[in-house]
Amino acid sequence: MELSANGSTVTIEGNIKTIGDYNTIRSAVQGIVDGGSTSVTLQIPNSISLTSSIIGYLLKLAKKDGINVVAKIGDSRLHELLEELNLIEAFNVQKV
C-alpha cells in the first residue's frame, strides 16, 4: 500500500490489509483533522477491502467527531462490501 496526502485528500494505492496500513492511514487522516479540517476525502482506486480497524476509526470520525468523511471507491468489490455493511451514507461513498 502507498499513501499520499494533498490538502484534505488522502489517496491510497494498493490493497489495504495490515495493521501497518491502518497506522499509516490513521496518522495521515488524523494529521488533516488536527490541522483543523472538518472534511476528509479518501481516494481508494484499487483496494478490494478495508480492515475493521480502519472502518471503526472512520466511523468514529464521522459519527462522534462530526468529520465529513468522503470515500471515493474505484473497485466494485469494496463498494459492495461498504454497501453490505450499510456504510454508504456514513462515508459518503462515491463510485469512481
Model-flagged regions — what are they?
Residues I16-F91:
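Amphipathic alpha-helical interaction surfaces in cytosolic regulatory modules
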Residues Q94-V96:
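Intrinsically disordered or low-complexity boundary/linker segments at protein termini
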Residues M1-T11:
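Short beta-strand/loop segment at the start of cytosolic alpha/beta domains
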